[in-house]
Amino acid sequence: MTVLSREARSALDEAIQEARRKAEQGARNALLVLGVDEERKPGYLTAEQAEIRRQLRTECRRLGSFDDLVRSVAYERWHRMLFARFLAENSLLIHPEFRVPVTLDECEEIAREEGRDLWEVAGDYAAEMLPGLFRRDSPVTRVRFAAEDTMALRSILARIPSETFLAEDALGWTYQFWQTDAKREVNASERKVEGYDICAVTQLFTEPYMVQFLLQNTLGAWWLHLHPDSPLRNEWRYYREGVQHDFSAWPESPAELKILDPCCGSGHFLVAAFHMLLAMRREVGEETEAAIRGILTENLHGLELDPRCIQIATFSIALEAWKAGFPTDSYLPVPNL
C-alpha cells in the first residue's frame, strides 16, 4: 500500500487549506456578481445567468444561508478539479466518445476548441465515469468563477506533486484538511457544537498503520483460518501469530462476507479492505472484473453523517477499482455507502 509520507501529507494539508480559502472567496465573488444575495435580479444578467441565479436562490434556501451556499459552491468547484487530476495522474480520465485516457493538457485544448473551461470539460469527463457521484444537474456546478479566482485554484493544484495523486490514502486525507479551518474556528469560539459544525469538529481519520493492523488481525486472520497456507500472510506485516479467534459465525467464502464501517469518513478502512478482499478473491480463482464487482456489490458497506465524506469515500474506492484493473469502458457499480 502506497501512502503519503509525513512531509507529503503536511504539504497537502497546507495546499488544501489554502485552496478552501481561495475557493470560498471565488465562490462568494461569483455569487455576488449573479446577485444571488439580492431580492431583485440585476439587469445585466443574460437569460441563462438569470435562470442559474433562480436555481441558486432555491438551493440557498434549501441549505439555510448564503454562507452555506458559498461553502457548497467552493467545495464543488475545488473537488471537481481535484478529482479530475486524481484521474488524470492515474491515466484514468477517459474521453467519453473515444474511450481513451486524456491528459489535462488535452482537456485544455478541447476546452479551447469548444469555448469552455478546462475544469468544466474535465469534470464532465469524470462525471461520465461515475454519474452517481458528480452532480452535473446541480446549479452549484454551473457557477462561473472569475478568471483570477480560477487561476489561483489552478496554481495551488499545480503545486501538488504528481506522486501525491498516486498514494492510496491521499484522497482520504483531503477532506480532513479541508475542514481544518472550520474545526479551528469552532473550537476557538467555544460555542455549542451543532449542525454544520458537527462534521468539522468530529472528523479525525485513522492513520494507515492502524487501519492495516486492525484489518489484518480480523479480516486477515479469518482468511488464514480458512487458508492456513495462503501466501497473503507474507504481505500482512502487522498480522500477529498465536492470537485466538472465534470465526464460527463467519462465512466460508469472500462472496458471503459483509463489512460495515459505521463511521466510514472518507473511506480509509474501506479502501484497505477493498485491496485485501481483491487479493482473497483472486486467490480462489476469480477474474479481476468479477471480483471487483462482487466486492462493491456484496462486501463493502459504509455509513457516514456527512454526504461530502460519502462522496470522497465513493470516489476513493472507485479510483482503486480502476487502478486495480476494472475496465474503464464497463459500468462500475456504485459502492453501498
PLM feature spans:
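Preference for the N-terminal adenyl/adenosyl cofactor-binding alpha/beta module
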Residues: 1-278, 299, 303-312, 335
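Conserved adenine-binding aromatic site and its adjacent loop/helix in ATP-hydrolyzing domains
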Residues: 315, 319
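Short, solvent-exposed loop/turn segments at the edges of secondary structure
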Residues: 295-296, 332
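Catalytic micro-motifs at enzyme active sites that drive phosphoryl/nucleotidyl and oxygen chemistry
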Residues: 70-71, 248, 289, 325-327
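Post-Walker A helix-loop "phosphate-sensing" segment adjacent to the P-loop in P-loop NTPases
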Residues: 279-284
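Short, charged/polar low-complexity linear motifs in solvent-exposed/disordered segments
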Residues: 230-231, 288, 328-330
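S-adenosyl-L-methionine
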Residues: 320-337
